[in-house]
Amino acid sequence: DKKEPDMFLLSECKAPEENEKINLGCLVIGSQPLKISWEPKKSSIVEHVFPSEMRNGNYTMVLQVTVLASELNLNHTCTINKPKRKEKPFKFPESWDSQSSKRVTPTLQAKNHSTEATKAITTKKDIEGAMAPSNLTVNILTTSTHPEMSSWLLCEVSGFFPENIHLMWLGVHSKMKSTNFVTANPTAQPGGTFQTWSVLRLPVALSSSLDTYTCVVEHEASKTKLNASKSLAISGCYHLLPESDGPSRRPDGPALA
């Protein structure tokens, strides 16, 4: 029998204002062609399915929806309709309850030559016991063989406490639009710290002529900013998808809540 597809629900790390729109994502990985949808169907919900890609026998598909924050009280559900029906409801991240409505605007700029993670100087901590994120990586997730298809970058960060953290992506000259990426809710890891990840959809397939992309991480509690970059001219890809057996989990870590 074919293994059931893995489903991962994604949301922005920061709680939205009541009048704002927010992006939610559903990442599905399975051994068979997939068909996924989002419920409920409403004219105010903008739905976009990124083209399915296959790598090492696994199909990967991302469904992204943009919804009004005021409508998050609805029963939002990601549903796999093919090959076998399976659904997963969206749940509010616990971290949203503790977040202030005030937002922080990152001031970091992308550096074309940067290919390693760089850490800003950590100043006095506002929260007792706060731990700055220590591990940040950006890797190529998949590479399409067709120009009309998209490629993906995966940014992973871990070792931080408390869990409130902000991730964003930069191109060479400007910040990437939030409609181009989705970020997972932070999950606990051994030692009382947290980890999270973000997937960026690139507008075109990988090419040596394309630019460098930078993942920026802001952890306000520890007054820490990190950034890591990946040049698309670097050859080779990283296989970060889960194996065909075993329990459901995120591409490189424990299951999402």
From Swiss-Prot:
The keyword Flavoprotein does not apply. SMART domains: IGc1. Disulfide bonds join C26-C78. Residues 96-111 have a biased composition (Polar residues). The keyword ATP-binding does not apply. It is found in: Secreted. Residues 89-111 are annotated as: Disordered. Cell lines producing IgD contain several mRNA species for Ig delta chains. In plasmacytomas, the secreted form is the major component, and the membrane-bound form is a minor component. In spleen, however, the membrane-bound form is the major component. These two forms differ in their C-terminal segments. It comes from the Eukaryota. InterPro entries: Ig-like_dom, Ig-like_dom_sf, Ig-like_fold, Ig/MHC_CS, Ig_C1-set, Immune_Resp_Modulators. Coiled coil: none annotated. Glycans are attached at N58, N75, N112, N135, N227. This is Ig delta chain C region secreted form. It comes from Mus musculus. The lineage of its organism: Eukaryota, Metazoa, Chordata, Craniata, Vertebrata.
